[in-house]
Amino acid sequence: MSEALLNTGRQTLMLELQEASRLPERLGDDFVRAANIILHCEGKVVVSGIGKSGHIGKKIAATLASTGTPAFFVHPAEALHGDLGMIESRDVMLFISYSGGAKELDLIIPRLEDKSIALLAMTGKPTSPLGLAAKAVLDISVEREACPMHLAPTSSTVNTLMMGDALAMAVMQARGFNEEDFARSHPAGALGARLLNKVHHLMRRDDAIPQVALTASVMDAMLELSRTGLGLVAVCDAQQQVQGVFTDGDLRRWLVGGGALTTPVNEAMTTGGTTLQAQSRAIDAKEVLMKRKITAAPVVDENGKLTGAINLQDFYQAGII
């Protein structure tokens, strides 16, 4: 029994791979035409399909939308009962139907023509009514389905998904869509956290900023270290310009060397030190800390004025790893 299950599973995968391997050679003028129509679309790409084609169509619409092409899915039956009103003349419709003869098309195609809406077809029958009505046809035909009964859409749905990915990626690259663009449409994801967050989004503010004046003593700085627990204190002049930092390490070295706690902190601090810009990308700031092997740093504004503080734990808590 187990061997039979494995054999069927492997055979299914082999058949799907075999059919999918024929797709690249089919890409030609129609693929380029479809991509250009989408690229020059001033509205949205409306993806539609019935049954398994509809399920794949939802994924294709989602992929387009997340890679720079506004898109949504509409079910053909819903389209014929009011949702055609969602589609405007500046939109493009991508209709998926393996047979290319879905009965809904008899009613949808004339309405698209009335509105001068460009129709793209993804079908296994390029000479079907759908294929003949479309401005570009993407051929997803298969010699056989992977289903042992040759009935359930299997190889054909894989081909549909792959053709949709190929189209979306070609359009994405042509748009110059980059990582930051992707992050803007995925703000809650790990990539969004890495690329969209700025230092000022994560930094500690107000009373949570460890700081003392240049005139403060080592004792004052030690108490501030203890209060904030950040591992450093920013030492600032009267204009809030950071002149140096006093760290846990500086304190240990000062005490081991016999330094007095009443000494001005500017004699014990690390002059200058690393500061981070509030408007910098958080991922870049984290890399600065990692490269310099420090765990925290003061944050300054464009004028060099102290405005916050941040440590590595703040990055990790924001999902920037």
From Swiss-Prot:
Top-level taxon in the UniProt lineage: Bacteria
Species this protein is from: Shigella flexneri
Domain CBS: 203-261, 269-321
Name used for this protein in its record: Arabinose 5-phosphate isomerase GutQ
Assembly and oligomerization: Homotetramer.
Reaction(s) catalysed (UniProt annotation): D-arabinose 5-phosphate = D-ribulose 5-phosphate
Record gene name: gutQ
GO biological process annotation, one example: keto-3-deoxy-D-manno-octulosonic acid biosynthetic process
CDD domains: CBS_pair_SIS_assoc (cd04604), SIS_Kpsf (cd05014)
Residues the entry annotates as binding ATP: G49, I50, G51, K52, S53, G54
Keywords: ATP-binding, CBS domain, Isomerase, Lipopolysaccharide biosynthesis, Metal-binding, Nucleotide-binding, Repeat, Zinc
